[in-house]
Protein backbone atom coordinates (compact mmCIF):
# COMPACT_ATOMS: atom_id res chain seq x y z
CA UNK A 1 0.00 0.00 0.00
CA UNK A 2 1.23 3.46 -0.91
CA UNK A 3 2.43 5.65 1.96
CA UNK A 4 2.19 9.46 1.92
CA UNK A 5 3.98 11.69 4.41
CA UNK A 6 2.30 14.86 5.67
CA UNK A 7 3.29 17.43 8.27
CA UNK A 8 0.84 18.55 10.95
CA UNK A 9 0.97 21.29 13.57
CA UNK A 10 -0.62 21.11 17.04
CA UNK A 11 -3.50 23.44 17.72
CA UNK A 12 -4.72 24.93 20.97
CA UNK A 13 -7.99 26.58 19.91
CA UNK A 14 -10.41 23.67 19.55
CA UNK A 15 -13.68 25.56 19.18
CA UNK A 16 -15.69 26.69 16.18
CA UNK A 17 -13.89 30.01 15.92
CA UNK A 18 -10.46 28.37 16.00
CA UNK A 19 -11.46 25.91 13.26
CA UNK A 20 -12.93 28.69 11.13
CA UNK A 21 -9.74 30.76 11.46
CA UNK A 22 -7.66 27.74 10.39
CA UNK A 23 -9.81 27.23 7.28
CA UNK A 24 -9.46 30.90 6.34
CA UNK A 25 -5.67 30.37 6.39
CA UNK A 26 -6.02 27.31 4.06
CA UNK A 27 -5.50 24.80 6.86
CA UNK A 28 -7.66 21.80 7.73
CA UNK A 29 -8.46 20.95 11.36
CA UNK A 30 -7.73 17.28 12.08
CA UNK A 31 -7.93 14.74 14.90
CA UNK A 32 -5.85 11.58 15.40
CA UNK A 33 -7.75 8.78 17.19
CA UNK A 34 -6.57 5.37 18.37
CA UNK A 35 -3.80 6.32 20.78
CA UNK A 36 -3.90 6.93 24.53
CA UNK A 37 -5.55 10.29 23.90
CA UNK A 38 -6.85 12.23 20.92
CA UNK A 39 -4.43 14.58 19.20
CA UNK A 40 -5.81 17.78 17.68
CA UNK A 41 -3.75 19.36 14.90
CA UNK A 42 -4.01 21.14 11.58
CA UNK A 43 -2.52 20.41 8.17
CA UNK A 44 -2.12 22.73 5.15
CA UNK A 45 -4.95 22.00 2.72
CA UNK A 46 -2.74 21.34 -0.32
CA UNK A 47 -1.09 18.34 1.41
CA UNK A 48 -4.34 16.36 1.14
CA UNK A 49 -4.10 16.35 -2.66
CA UNK A 50 -2.12 13.07 -2.63
CA UNK A 51 -4.32 11.42 -0.01
CA UNK A 52 -7.98 12.21 -0.68
CA UNK A 53 -8.16 13.13 -4.35
CA UNK A 54 -6.52 9.99 -5.77
CA UNK A 55 -7.99 6.72 -6.97
CA UNK A 56 -5.98 4.53 -4.58
CA UNK A 57 -6.03 4.04 -0.83
CA UNK A 58 -2.92 4.90 1.13
CA UNK A 59 -1.47 4.97 4.61
CA UNK A 60 -0.30 8.27 6.05
CA UNK A 61 2.96 8.91 7.85
CA UNK A 62 1.98 11.89 9.99
CA UNK A 63 4.86 14.05 11.21
CA UNK A 64 3.43 16.00 14.14
CA UNK A 65 6.07 18.36 15.51
CA UNK A 66 8.86 15.79 15.44
CA UNK A 67 6.86 12.67 16.33
CA UNK A 68 5.78 10.30 13.57
CA UNK A 69 2.51 8.37 13.53
CA UNK A 70 1.46 5.75 10.99
CA UNK A 71 -2.27 6.16 10.34
CA UNK A 72 -5.10 6.05 7.81
CA UNK A 73 -7.80 8.55 6.92
CA UNK A 74 -10.92 7.45 8.78
CA UNK A 75 -13.42 10.17 7.84
CA UNK A 76 -13.44 13.29 5.66
CA UNK A 77 -15.97 16.12 5.90
CA UNK A 78 -16.64 18.47 2.98
CA UNK A 79 -18.68 21.67 2.83
CA UNK A 80 -22.07 20.74 1.32
CA UNK A 81 -22.13 23.59 -1.21
CA UNK A 82 -18.59 24.49 -2.25
CA UNK A 83 -17.05 21.08 -1.39
CA UNK A 84 -14.19 22.68 0.55
CA UNK A 85 -12.37 20.28 2.88
CA UNK A 86 -13.69 20.99 6.41
CA UNK A 87 -12.29 18.30 8.71
CA UNK A 88 -10.30 15.05 8.59
CA UNK A 89 -10.20 12.23 11.17
CA UNK A 90 -7.17 9.93 11.22
CA UNK A 91 -6.92 6.50 12.87
CA UNK A 92 -3.62 5.36 14.35
CA UNK A 93 -2.52 1.98 12.96
CA UNK A 94 -1.50 -0.92 15.17
CA UNK A 95 0.08 -3.91 13.39
CA UNK A 96 -1.66 -6.31 15.80
CA UNK A 97 -5.20 -4.91 15.28
CA UNK A 98 -7.42 -5.12 12.23
CA UNK A 99 -8.65 -1.85 10.78
CA UNK A 100 -11.73 -0.95 8.72
CA UNK A 101 -11.10 1.21 5.67
CA UNK A 102 -12.88 2.23 2.47
CA UNK A 103 -10.93 1.02 -0.57
CA UNK A 104 -11.62 2.17 -4.18
CA UNK A 105 -12.88 -0.37 -6.73
CA UNK A 106 -11.19 -0.73 -10.15
CA UNK A 107 -12.15 -3.03 -13.02
CA UNK A 108 -9.91 -5.44 -14.90
CA UNK A 109 -10.59 -7.18 -18.16
CA UNK A 110 -12.88 -6.36 -21.08
CA UNK A 111 -16.57 -7.08 -20.78
CA UNK A 112 -18.19 -8.98 -23.70
CA UNK A 113 -21.38 -7.04 -22.95
CA UNK A 114 -19.61 -3.73 -23.54
CA UNK A 115 -18.15 -5.05 -26.81
CA UNK A 116 -21.71 -5.91 -27.93
CA UNK A 117 -22.79 -2.30 -27.33
CA UNK A 118 -23.69 -2.24 -23.64
CA UNK A 119 -22.66 0.45 -21.20
CA UNK A 120 -20.62 -0.34 -18.07
CA UNK A 121 -22.17 1.44 -15.08
CA UNK A 122 -20.26 1.54 -11.81
CA UNK A 123 -22.69 1.24 -8.88
CA UNK A 124 -20.18 1.38 -6.00
CA UNK A 125 -16.99 3.48 -5.96
CA UNK A 126 -15.53 2.12 -2.69
CA UNK A 127 -15.98 -0.95 -0.53
CA UNK A 128 -15.36 -1.22 3.20
CA UNK A 129 -12.58 -3.67 4.02
CA UNK A 130 -11.36 -5.14 7.30
CA UNK A 131 -7.74 -6.30 7.48
CA UNK A 132 -4.43 -5.99 9.27
CA UNK A 133 -2.52 -2.88 8.11
CA UNK A 134 0.03 -4.95 6.15
CA UNK A 135 -2.76 -6.67 4.18
CA UNK A 136 -4.74 -3.56 3.15
CA UNK A 137 -4.95 -3.31 -0.67
CA UNK A 138 -4.44 -0.12 -2.70
CA UNK A 139 -7.50 -0.94 -4.81
CA UNK A 140 -10.01 -3.78 -5.05
CA UNK A 141 -9.95 -5.37 -8.51
CA UNK A 142 -13.25 -6.61 -9.91
CA UNK A 143 -12.96 -8.93 -12.92
CA UNK A 144 -15.46 -7.98 -15.66
CA UNK A 145 -14.11 -10.27 -18.39
CA UNK A 146 -17.20 -12.56 -18.16
CA UNK A 147 -19.77 -9.76 -17.78
CA UNK A 148 -22.55 -10.01 -20.40
CA UNK A 149 -25.38 -7.60 -21.30
CA UNK A 150 -27.83 -6.91 -18.44
CA UNK A 151 -25.61 -8.76 -15.95
CA UNK A 152 -23.72 -7.44 -12.93
CA UNK A 153 -20.72 -8.18 -10.74
CA UNK A 154 -21.73 -8.43 -7.09
CA UNK A 155 -19.56 -7.96 -4.00
CA UNK A 156 -19.65 -11.73 -3.41
CA UNK A 157 -18.05 -12.31 -6.86
CA UNK A 158 -14.88 -10.38 -5.97
CA UNK A 159 -11.87 -12.48 -4.96
CA UNK A 160 -10.18 -11.28 -1.77
CA UNK A 161 -6.65 -11.85 -0.54
CA UNK A 162 -6.00 -11.61 3.24
CA UNK A 163 -8.84 -9.11 3.78
CA UNK A 164 -12.60 -9.24 4.29
CA UNK A 165 -15.13 -7.08 2.43
CA UNK A 166 -17.77 -5.92 4.93
CA UNK A 167 -20.41 -4.83 2.41
CA UNK A 168 -23.34 -7.19 1.73
CA UNK A 169 -22.47 -9.91 -0.80
CA UNK A 170 -25.58 -9.17 -2.90
CA UNK A 171 -24.73 -5.51 -3.63
CA UNK A 172 -23.89 -4.96 -7.33
CA UNK A 173 -20.52 -3.29 -7.93
CA UNK A 174 -21.08 -2.72 -11.65
CA UNK A 175 -23.65 -3.57 -14.30
CA UNK A 176 -23.66 -3.69 -18.10
CA UNK A 177 -26.84 -1.92 -19.13
CA UNK A 178 -28.52 -2.28 -22.50
CA UNK A 179 -28.75 1.10 -24.27
CA UNK A 180 -32.14 2.23 -25.59
CA UNK A 181 -30.97 2.06 -29.22
CA UNK A 182 -29.91 -1.58 -28.79
CA UNK A 183 -33.28 -2.42 -27.18
CA UNK A 184 -35.09 -0.83 -30.16
CA UNK A 185 -32.99 -2.83 -32.63
CA UNK A 186 -33.80 -6.07 -30.77
CA UNK A 187 -37.52 -5.19 -30.70
CA UNK A 188 -37.50 -4.45 -34.45
CA UNK A 189 -35.71 -7.73 -35.16
CA UNK A 190 -38.23 -9.63 -33.02
CA UNK A 191 -41.17 -8.17 -35.01
CA UNK A 192 -39.75 -9.43 -38.33
From Swiss-Prot:
Top-level taxonomy: Bacteria, Pseudomonadati, Bacteroidota, Cytophagia, Cytophagales
Reported function: This is one of the proteins that binds to the 5S RNA in the ribosome where it forms part of the central protuberance.
Alphabetized PANTHER family for the sequence: RIBOSOMAL PROTEIN L25/GLN-TRNA SYNTHETASE, ANTI-CODON-BINDING DOMAIN-CONTAINING PROTEIN (PTHR33284), RIBOSOMAL PROTEIN L25_GLN-TRNA SYNTHETASE, ANTI-CODON-BINDING DOMAIN-CONTAINING PROTEIN (PTHR33284:SF1)
tRNA processing found in the keyword field: no
CDD domains documented for this protein: Ribosomal_L25_TL5_CTC
GO annotation, biological process: translation
Protein name from the UniProt record: Large ribosomal subunit protein bL25
Keyword entries, A-Z: Ribonucleoprotein, Ribosomal protein, RNA-binding, rRNA-binding
Family statement drawn from the similarity comment of this UniProt entry: Belongs to the bacterial ribosomal protein bL25 family. CTC subfamily.
Gene Ontology CC, one term: cytosolic large ribosomal subunit
Pfam families assigned: Ribosomal_L25p (PF01386), Ribosomal_TL5_C (PF14693)
Subunit structure: Part of the 50S ribosomal subunit; part of the 5S rRNA/L5/L18/L25 subcomplex. Contacts the 5S rRNA. Binds to the 5S rRNA independently of L5 and L18.
KW Transit peptide (keyword) present: no
Gene Ontology terms for molecular function: 5S rRNA binding; structural constituent of ribosome
Amino acid sequence: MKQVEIIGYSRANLGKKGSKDLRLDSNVPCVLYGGESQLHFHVPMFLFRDIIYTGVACTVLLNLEGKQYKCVVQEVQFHPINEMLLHVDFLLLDDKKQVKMNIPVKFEGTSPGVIKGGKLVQKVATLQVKAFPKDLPDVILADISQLELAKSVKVGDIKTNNYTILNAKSIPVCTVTIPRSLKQEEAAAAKK
